[in-house]
Each structure stands twice: as structure tokens, then as C-alpha cells.
UniProtKB/Swiss-Prot annotation:
Keyword Acetylation: yes
Source species of the chain: Mus musculus (Mouse)
Bias (Basic and acidic residues): 976-990
Keywords of the record: Acetylation, Activator, DNA-binding, Metal-binding, Nucleus, Phosphoprotein, Repeat, Transcription, Transcription regulation, Zinc, Zinc-finger
Name listed for the protein in its UniProt record: Transcriptional-regulating factor 1
Pfam families, per database record: ELM2, zf-C2H2_6
Main location as per UniProt: nucleus
UniProt feature, compositional bias: Polar residues: 406-417, 437-447, 487-498, 604-613
Domain ELM2: 785-876
N6-acetyllysine sites (modified residues): 639, 646
Tissue: Highly expressed in kidney, lung and brain. In the brain, expression was seen in the basal ganglia, hippocampus, piriform cortex, cerebral cortex, ventromedial nucleus of the hypothalamus and the dorsal and superior central nuclei of the raphe.
Domain (SANT): residue spans on this chain: 891-942
Amino acid sequence: MGDQQLYKTNHVGHGGENLFYQQPPLGVHSGLGHSYGNTISGAGMDAPQASPISPHFPQDTRDGLGLPIGSKNLGQMDTSRQGGWGSHAGPGNHVQLRSNLANSNMMWGTPTQVEPADGYQYTYSQASEIRTQKLTSGVLHKLDSFTQVFANQNLRIQVNNMAQVLHTQSAVMDGASDSALRQLLSQKPVEPSASAIASRYQQVPQQPHPGFTGGLPKPALPVGQHAPQGHLYYDYQQPLAQMSMQGGQPLQAPQVLSGHMQQLQQHQYYPQPPPQQQQAGLQRISVQEMQQQQQPQQIRPSPPQQQQQLQLQQRQSSLQIPQYYQPQPMMQHLQEQQQPSMHLQPPSYHRDPHQYTPEQAHAVQLIQLGSMPQYYYQEPQQAYSHPLYPQSHLSQHQQREDGQLKTYSSDRQTPAMLSSHGDMGTSDTGVADPASSEMTRVTSTLPHQPLLSPSGIHLNNMGSQHQQPPSPSAMWPQMHLPDGRAQSGSPESSSGQTKGVFGEQFDAKNKLTCSICLKEFKSLPALNGHMRSHGGMRASPSLKQEEGEKAPPPQPQPQPQPQQPLPPPPPPPPPPQLPPEAERLTPMVMPVSVPVKLIPPKPSSQGFTNSVAATPAARDKPASSMSDDEMPVLEIPRKHPPIAAKVEEPLKNLPEKKKFRHRPEPLFIPPPPSSYTPNPTSYSGATLYQSQLRSPRILGDHLLLDPAHELPPYTPPPMLSPVRQGSGLFSNVLISGHGPGVHPQLPLTPLTPTPRVLLCRSSSIDGSNVTVTPGPGEQTVDVEPRINIGLRFQAEIPELQDVSALAQDTHRATLVWKPWPELENQALQQQVENLLNLCCSSALPGGGTNSEFALHSLFEAKGDVMATLEMLLLRKPVRLKCHPLANYHYAGSDKWTSLERKLFNKALATYSKDFIFVQKMVKSKTVAQCVEYYYTWKKIMRLGRKHRTRLAEIIDDCMTSEEEEEAEEEEEDPEEDRKSIKEEESEVAKSPEPPPAPALAPTEGPPMQAVGQQPSGNFICEMPNCGAVFSSRQALNGHARIHGGTNQVAKTRGAIPSGKQKPGGTQSGYCSVKSSPSHSTTSGETDPTTIFPCKECGKVFFKIKSRNAHMKTHRQQEEQQRQKAQKAAFAAEMAATIERTTGPVGAPELLPLDQLSLMKPVKDVDILDDDVVQQLGVMDEAEVVGTDLLLDDQDSVLLQGDTEL
């Protein structure tokens, strides 16, 4: 009764806490969004300590309930209460869970809630921790016995039984062992937070019971309640926390639990079929959470070890209970809150990691108690039966209970979980007594053992006990579980607790290992994609526990019992378990021990059949078909070295989980059965598949009756199965009838209404005959390889005939147009040619642009040449708008004014043939018109060249003045050079006209003037028909060599009178100002700033590079001249010096003096310039200029002109 009263007191504290739990817990469950974190923390802290059920917290701590809830770390206490009180975990949900859990579950939930609340919400004093440690040894044994005894009782006990259990627990708390039990219970509720998640799933109906007093007896409560509550706390983020807070108020808790259970059911799609295992992991989690909550501040003493242990426990719990994913924030808060109080306990757990395991097992039991409906919890467990689902993982743990639980207890994860659940008194007790640590391992093993469905979990004493006390952490994780992702079992929550952030981050060290090739992967999606390379089958991912994995094997339903034999301390055993399971190629199964935030891919493998919370969509979906958010992210705690090393790992922040793109199902090509390939060797190992396009049937009777019947066309069978799984035509039809995550044996034919046809052949290539008898409902198809013969496949080639037969054949082509016979007459052809020539002359406006118009006119005149000529001589006829050629544009018919032509020439000289810039300068014409004008002029120039050639008989050496491009070695007509700007532009516009006779062309200033050459200092060639102008005598001398190499007497004129140029003479191409092919006019029309005349010879270039190349010839000439001048000067000085000498020239003694005197003249020769050379006047032109240089000069000019054209 005393205990019961204490329990009631705790309930009062919890009731206050429950109220506060209803508020978002700021301290512990801030992440969970519950208020019980702050306000409850104070009350909860006091209540758990005072509660008789929580051995960790002395009853004087219960007295602390009176303290303001906000004053103490109530958030932590709430978490612990939730972990400790199955009903308290969620004010309504936990109470319902207790009621649903059965008497033992309720009992466990009640004591656990009280103590976990203390663990989670209160940073209980170290004295209480020490007390719990001292009591650990005896309490652990009692807890173990309680867990074993009350495992079944939890399933049976109802709300009334829960009350009795509370009383029993309070009575037990009176003694030292009772206090130890309380401590264990209080710690376990923290881990129960993890297990509470599973219990919440399974025990949702049980928790609705309003009173914890009616729950399980105290002994069962400590073992199961703590872990389940902690788990439930995680599952029911807000509701579970409230329920754990409401451990003192059973009535309020059931209501809240009911609501939370609904949430949990919604969230926890994957009920874990083995609630006991889940409870075991949850108990560990709850213990860790309680320790963390109690020792958030105390974690400092042994942070590395405790964190490592917490990670190990969290990993185990996460592997066992996926609920940790969702309640990660709560787990973090619980750990933080528990760690201060658990500060002393973590060392004990670190000392004996096995102790953590028992506590973890209690946490799992508490979770089960905390979880509202056991069946719901069981479903999550079933869902987590896969390696990826913590709940199923719990079931696996239960099956593996001995090896796995011991291993986990030995693993640092177990201590980490206990340390993270600072509430757990078992941690303290474990420190005090190693036997108690083993008890804890046993208890944890018991919760892990229940691989049963939710009902099976309830049947298990430990499992039910775990389920009864919905630890706030466990409940919270289940709140996260609604996301369809296992949280309690998630490595995030486990590692997150160790780090202070429960489920938020994944352990970067956690990796998944392919069970076939042992390749490591960082995430489940990556592993799933890799498994496609192994035949498209999904193997349960082997989670590589690198840092002392505590997570149970990730394998699906098969629970690796190899872990059971493994010693509890060695963390490595779990990985071996994973490979064995992984070896079994089952449809992608999530390992229960692997913390996963994922919807179970296969309900059967996860024990989903019993899961109520799991949505049907989640069950049906294959793992690969999940959305990116739903894709599981598996991280298994690595095998941890010594605890010290593992302590450092928990400190590391886990990398945030990454979203993985959905990957399509692997290509699955079903091999053709032997019945469909009777003689596969006939195709040299190739397999035959039935074509889905067509399957012509051969009816034997019809062939016998109608021998003339043609065989159906032979189509080679497809090399790949036309019904292979993929995104093709039949993919949806084939996949719809099969379960998710499984690669069904696809039929060889698609599900089409047509009957299946049997592929067979009467004979094969190798000569072997195979007789195939079609089965019932099957029809044979002739697939014997053959060449299809017939009119449909081959053309009949007629016999060769004589070529003369072609004359008899009538042309089958349609006659479109046939010319008149007269057009073939030569005389008529000549008339048409003459007409076109006339049209291109100056007789008609438009000149050469009239050729097309002339042909159109001739067509309209129906071939009458005279009528066409009359039409052309008259004004342009006005065509009707309906005329086909009314809007036709004849090339060259545009009107260009003198200003436009001038601008065009200037732009063409500046930008060459970049007509976009040319048009910008002309502005009044379009780019198309500028292009047309340029090429029309080019065409006219060629025509004009021909006409000039015919008219050049009266002119000696007359050559057409074409563009430098075509003028190459020809000299431009001086008449063209002397044309006025207007005449030249008009010629460009109307170039079709033959150029007027040279005699008619008025003589104007030479192009050099137009170019802008200086009037003075010009040297003009006096040769007949030349008149080339040069700026220097050397240039003129070089030019004179063209006229026979004789020296020409050059005249220097200030101005070159136009009359001195002979009309008929041709101007040298070198002197021609019109070096640009674009100009038919004098260079005077061009902008002087855009031309580059040569200062030596007067040649004009439109590109600086062309002039620079040309100047090299002058430099070479000048260099030769300088050398010759130097020689001449040196010779003259030598002669003068010799004459001045007194002695004989050849006197040896004077030679040195002579040499010295000659040094200065030699130096003077070096500075001689062109003027000095010219003054010497002793050099012949032939000596100064070489023929090869002149040729080079010509070539350079011509090339320059060509490039511009």
C-alpha cells in the first residue's frame, strides 16, 4: 500500500506532468512538439524520484513533485515517465496502452512511467543514481525475474491489474531492492521509450486503461515498462510524453493514450511482430533516454563512454524499433535530460555493457506497455521484422534474444542506450552489480526474444512488460513512425541520442553490407539498387556494424540466432548474423535491427499481417517503389572498438539522411522453361521466347486437307523475353498481380486474352528432330527457321529482253512540258541569244539585269523575238495585280542614288563584305539589297570586261579594268581611272552597259590626286602609254624595269596634269589607286582614312597588313641599296685616305695607321641613309633593284586584291 500510495503520489506528479505533457515538452521533447518538456520536467523529475516504482528516483524525489514543474528538468522527467509509465508516456495513449497491454503490461507501464518520467524529466541527483546503482545488482535480478514472470501478466493485466502492479511496485520500493527496482524501472522507462513505440503499436487498446495501478505487478513493470515507455515516448512524440507525464494520473493518461495510440497507429505503419524484441530495444532506449535525461548534465563525467553506449543502445533500439526515427527530437531531449541524472550510471553501463542490455530490454517492455494497442505495436514489430524495420528487428531480437541481447548488452550501443536514457536505474544498478548487468542483458534479451506478432509479444512476459510501460521516447518514435518510417530502430535515433540529437542524424559510420558480395553501402536505396545486379532479387541488407554494432541483424523475419551464441560483449557478432540472413535472397527485406525510416516493403516479412498501424499502401508498396521521402535510410552502428573509442564516435554528428531518387526495378528476364525450348541447343545456346506480336497457328488437319495451304510467315523468335519486367507495355499488367518487393516468376507470355501458343519446330539446324506435344489449351506455332518464300517476300525477275523493245514501250510518265520543235532550230537559237545580249547592253535601262526580264517577256510573247524587243524598248509594262509576276523582284532593278552608291563604296572599303555594317552605313537600303547590288556589280564587271576586250582593238595594251581580284596581271584602263566619281558610280550601278570608248571618257586628275597624294615630290614614268606616278626615285626606277630596264628620266611635278596621261594608255596596276576590287570608281570616292597608300611606290592598300607586307619589298631594296652605298662610300674613303697618306699605300708599317683611320669612315657609313645613297649617284638602277623583288611586289598586290575580293 505504501508503494501504492507512493505510486499515487507519482501519479499526481505525473498527472501534473501529463498536463504539462499535453503542453509541448520544451526540455525533453521539444523536438517532439510536446509541452511536457519544461513544465513537466520539474514535476516529472520530482515525481519519478519519489515514485516507488522508479527505483532510480527516491521517494524524496517524489516529494519534489511539489516543486514547480518548470523549475526542474521536467521535460526530461516527462520523457522518463513516459518511458517508465506505460500509460504516462502519452496522457491518453499510455493509459490506453497499459489497459491494452494486459495486467503485466499495465503494471510495467505504471512503474516504468513513474521512474522513466523521473529519468526523462528529472535530472535526478547523483545520490539517487548511486542508490540505484547500489540497488542494481539485486534489482536487476528482481527485474529479470519480474520480466520473465510478468511477461505474460503484462498481456493479461488490464487497467485494474496495472493499479495492482503499481501497488506491488510501491511495496517493493520500500526495500533497498525495491528502490533498486524502482531505479531500474525508472531507467527502463527511458529505454521503454524505444520499446514503448512498439508497445504503443501493439498496446494501443491496452493503454486506454485509465489507471496504471491496474497495470502489471511491480516486478514486471520495472523490466518491461521502462523500455516500452521510453520507446512509446519516442513513438508518441507528444501524446506519449504526455502519457508518461500522466503516470500519476491513470485516467487522464488512458484518454491521451487513446489519442496518441491513434496517432501511433497512423504513424507506425509497421507494427513490429516481435514486440518483446522491440521492447527489449525500447527498454534499452528508454534506459538510455532516462539516463540521458537524468544525466544530461552528468554525461560530462563519462561523455565518450556514455555516448558510445548510448549509440550502441540507440542503434540496437533503432535496429529493434524504427520508432526512433520519428521521435528523434524526443530521444535527443530524453538523452539530454537523462544524461545529467545518468551521469553516474553511464560509467556503470560502460563498465558492464551487459547491464545496458537488460535495461534496454526493460525499455522495450516499457515501450510495449506505453504503446497503446499491443496489436498495433505488434504490427510495427512485424513491419520491422525485416532488417530495416526495428519492430521486426525486435522480433528478431527476441528470437535472437540470447545472442543478440547479450551482444547488444556487451556492445557499447547498449550502454549508450542506457546512458542516453539516463532515467534507467539499471544503469546505476548495473554499475553497482555486474550480475545485475547480466540480468539486464537477460531482460533485454527477453524483450528482444519476442519475435512474436503483437499478440505474441504480449504473450511474452518481458515483451508484454515492455509493451505496457510506453516510454515517452518510444511513444514519440511512434509518433514519428506514422511517417511510415521506423524510428525507434533507426540508427539516427540511436546515434542521435548518443550525440544529444536522437533521431535527427544518422551515424555516418553505419553502413549496409550486401549479403552476397559483402559490398558496403551507405543507404538502403543504394543497397537495393546494387541487389539488382544479383538477379534482381532483394536480399535483406546486411548492416555492417562497424563500431560495435548493437543493432540486431538487419535481416528480415529470419532472426539470426548466430547473434545469440555470440558473446554479449562483442559487438561484431551482429554483422555475422546479417550476412547469413543476407545470403538468403528474399524479396527486399528490411533488417529489424537496422534503424530505418521506411515503410515495410513486405508485410509478410515484417509481420505486417498483424500490424494495424501500417497503412495498406505502405504494406503493398515495394521498397523500391517508395517515394524519396519514404525510402529507408539504413545506417547500422559500426562495430565499435573498445568503449573508449566508441565514446568518441557518438560525439560525431551523424550526417543528415539524403534523399535518394527512385530507382526502377531491376531488369528481370525470366528464363524460358524447357517446355518452351525443347531443343535449346539448336540455336547454339540461344534461348527462344514467344513473340508477343503475332503467333500464327498451324493447323495440322488443315495442312493435310489442303496441301496447297501456305505456311505462315516465319518470324525469328525474340532473343529477349518480351514479357521481361520493366517499364514496357506489359509492365503494369505483370506487376499488378504480385506482391511488393518480390520478383515474381513472370509468365513467358503477357496477360493477354489470346491463348498461349507453344513454340516448337519439327526439325532443327543441327538435324535433330524434336517432337513436341502441345499441352491442353496450347496451340503449336511453326518456329522452324526458314526463308519466307513467295510473292509477298520476293520479287519476280523477268527475263532479259532486247534493248530495241524499249521503243515499243509507251512512256507511262505524265507529259508536263514539251518545247516547240522550232526552239531546236539554230537560227532561232541565235536570235534569242542576240536578244539577250541587247538586253544586257546600255540600249535598255537596267543593263545586264534585264536578262531575266527579257526571258519572261519572250515567254509572254510566245517566242516572238520582235514583239519581245518592242516590249523591252517601251517603258516597263504595268502588270496586273493578279499577274503571277506582279510582285516579282528582278535582281539589279533597285534604284541607287549617287549618295547611296558613294556610301556603299565607302562602307565596302571599310568593312569589306560585311554587309551588315555596310547596310548600317548606307541605311537607306536593306542588307539584301546591298548584297544584291554588290554581286550584280561583280557580274556586270565581268560582262564589261568582255565588251572592253572586243573594243580594245583600237587601244594598244588595253586591258580590262577589273577588280584587283580579276585584274591580277592586267593593267586597269586609264579611262576607268580618270572617270569622274559620278561616272564611275553610275557605271557601278549600270555596269551592264559596256564601258564607253576611252576617247569619249573625259580625262580627269589622276587617281593619285583623288587618293590624296601630295602634289609635290611625285615621280612620273615618262614611258609612252604609262604615266605611273611614284613618290620616290627608287620606286620609279624599279618600275622602269618593266619597260625594258632602261633608266627613265623622271619629272618631279607639283601637280600631275590630267592631259599628260595618254587616253589610250593603261595605267600600271601598281600605281592604280583602285586596288580594291570593290571599287570600279576612282579611289577618290573612298574615305582617305580607310586607304593605306605606300609612301615609296604610291600603291594604295585597303588593309594595313597588305601594305606592311608590301613594305617588306621596299625594305629589302633599301637594305641592298644601303649595303651598296656603304661599299661605295667605304671605297671612296679608302681612296681618299690612301691619297692623304705620306707613305706608300702598301707600306706594311702604315697599314695599322691606315686601318685605324678607316674605322671612323666605316662607322659613318653605317649611319648613311637613303639621301646619302641617292647623292652618290653612282649606282645603276639595275644594281639597286632586283627583278625578283619587283615580281614579289606585283604578286603581293595581286594577292591583296584577291583576298579582299
